C-alpha cells in the first residue's frame, strides 16, 4: 500500500510538472504571437491563463513537499528550480498587472519555460527525490534566505533580459536622454535623424524604463538575501563571511547591479552603457546560481551536482 501511494504521488507530481511546462511553453508562443499580431488580444488572454495555470500547479508541487516533509522545499537544486520557476511566473503576473505591457511576458516566459524544462528533463531522477536535511539547513533561515535570494534572481533576470532586448533593438542607433530620462533621437553630421521611427523610439524608452524599474525592485531583495545569509552563516558555521564560491559570486552579482543602478544616475552612462552592465549581470546571476555548483566546492555545494 505504501509503495502504491508513493507511485501515485510520483505520478501526480510528474503530471503537474509536465502540464506546468506545457502551459509555460504555450504561453511563450502566445506572447510571441501577440508581439507579431498586436491586435489579436485573444493570444494575450490565453497566455495569461496558461501562466496562471502553471503558477498554480507549481504552488501545489511546492506546498505538497512542504506539508509532507515538514520543511520548505529549498534543500536541493531541483526544489530551488521549482521555486525559481514559480517566482518567475508570479513576478511576471504581478509586473504585467502593474505595468500593463506584453513585453514582460514575452521576456519572462522563455526563462521560466527553460528553467522548468531543465528541472524536469535534464536533472536525473535521483536529484528530484527528497533527502533528509543536513543539520546546517535545519533552520528557519532556510525559508528566509533562500526564498528571498531566488525572488531577487527572478527579478534581476527579467530586468536584465529587457536590457539585452534594448541593446538588440537599439543597435546602429545613437540615443540621447532628456532631463526626464526619456530617450531622444540623435542626428549625424548631415542633421539626418538616425532613429526615424517614433514608435520604435517609444518602444525603446518603454523597455529601458521597465528594465530599470524591475532591477530596482530586485536589488533590495538581493541585498536582504545576502545579509540574511551572513547572519545564518554565523549561526551555523560561526562566521558571517567565509569567501565561499557562492558567497563570492553573490557579492559580485550585488556589485554589478549596484554599478548598473549608479549608471542610471549618471546621464552620460544611461541607455546602451547601462544596458551593457545589466546584460553582463544576466550572465553573472546564472554563474552565481548554477555555474558555481559545478565546482562542487564550498559550504553551498551540498544537494547539488555532487
Swiss-Prot record:
Disulfide bonds: none annotated. One of its GO terms (biological process) is cytochrome complex assembly. It is found in: Plastid, Chloroplast thylakoid membrane. It comes from the Eukaryota. Pfam families: Cytochrom_C_asm. GO terms for molecular function: heme binding. Keywords: Chloroplast, Cytochrome c-type biogenesis, Membrane, Plastid, Thylakoid, Transmembrane, Transmembrane helix. InterPro entries: Cyt_c_assembly, Cyt_c_biogenesis_CcsA, Cyt_c_biogenesis_CcsA/CcmC. It is a multi-pass membrane protein. GO terms for cellular component: chloroplast thylakoid membrane; plasma membrane. The chain crosses the membrane at residues 17-37, 41-61, 77-97, 103-123, 148-168, 214-234, 241-261, 275-295. Although originally identified as Cyanidium caldarium, these sequences derive from Galdieria sulphuraria. May interact with Ccs1. Required during biogenesis of c-type cytochromes (cytochrome c6 and cytochrome f) at the step of heme attachment. NCBIfam families: cytochr_II_ccsB (TIGR03144). Belongs to the CcmF/CycK/Ccl1/NrfE/CcsA family. This is Cytochrome c biogenesis protein CcsA. The gene is ccsA.
Amino acid at each position: 500500500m505504501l509503495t502504491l501511494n508513493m507511485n501515485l504521488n510520483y505520478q501526480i507530481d510528474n503530471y503537474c510538472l509536465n502540464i506546468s511546462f506545457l502551459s509555460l511553453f504555450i504561453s511563450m508562443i502566445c506572447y510571441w504571437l501577440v508581439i507579431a499580431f498586436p491586435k489579436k488580444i485573444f493570444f494575450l488572454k490565453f497566455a495569461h491563463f496558461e501562466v496562471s495555470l502553471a503558477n498554480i500547479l507549481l504552488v501545489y508541487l511546492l506546498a505538497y513537499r512542504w506539508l509532507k516533509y515538514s520543511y520548505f522545499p529549498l534543500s536541493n537544486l531541483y526544489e530551488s528550480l521549482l521555486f525559481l520557476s514559480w517566482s518567475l511566473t508570479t513576478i511576471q503576473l504581478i509586473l504585467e498587472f502593474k505595468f500593463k505591457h506584453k513585453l514582460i511576458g514575452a521576456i519572462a516566459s522563455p526563462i521560466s519555460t527553460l528553467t522548468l524544462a531543465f528541472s524536469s528533463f535534464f536533472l536525473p531522477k535521483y536529484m528530484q527525490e527528497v533527502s533528509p536535511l543536513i543539520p546546517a539547513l535545519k533552520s528557519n533561515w532556510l525559508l528566509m534566505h533562500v526564498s528571498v535570494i531566488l525572488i531577487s534572481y527572478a527579478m534581476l533576470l527579467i530586468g536584465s533580459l529587457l536590457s539585452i532586448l534594448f541593446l538588440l533593438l537599439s543597435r546602429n542607433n545613437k540615443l540621447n536622454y532628456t532631463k526626464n530620462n526619456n530617450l531622444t533621437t540623435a542626428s549625424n553630421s548631415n542633421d539626418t535623424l538616425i532613429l526615424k521611427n517614433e514608435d520604435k523610439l517609444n518602444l525603446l524608452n518603454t523597455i529601458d524604463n521597465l528594465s530599470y524599474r524591475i532591477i530596482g525592485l530586485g536589488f533590495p531583495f538581493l541585498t536582504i538575501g545576502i545579509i540574511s545569509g551572513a547572519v545564518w552563516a554565523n549561526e551555523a558555521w560561526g562566521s558571517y563571511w567565509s569567501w565561499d564560491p557562492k558567497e563570492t559570486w553573490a557579492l559580485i552579482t550585488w556589485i554589478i547591479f549596484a554599478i548598473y543602478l549608479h549608471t542610471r544616475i549618471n546621464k552620460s552612462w544611461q541607455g546602451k552603457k547601462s544596458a551593457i552592465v545589466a546584460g553582463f549581470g544576466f550572465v553573472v546571476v546564472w554563474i552565481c546560481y548554477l555555474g558555481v555548483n559545478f565546482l562542487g566546492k564550498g559550504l553551498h555545494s551540498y544537494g547539488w551536482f555532487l
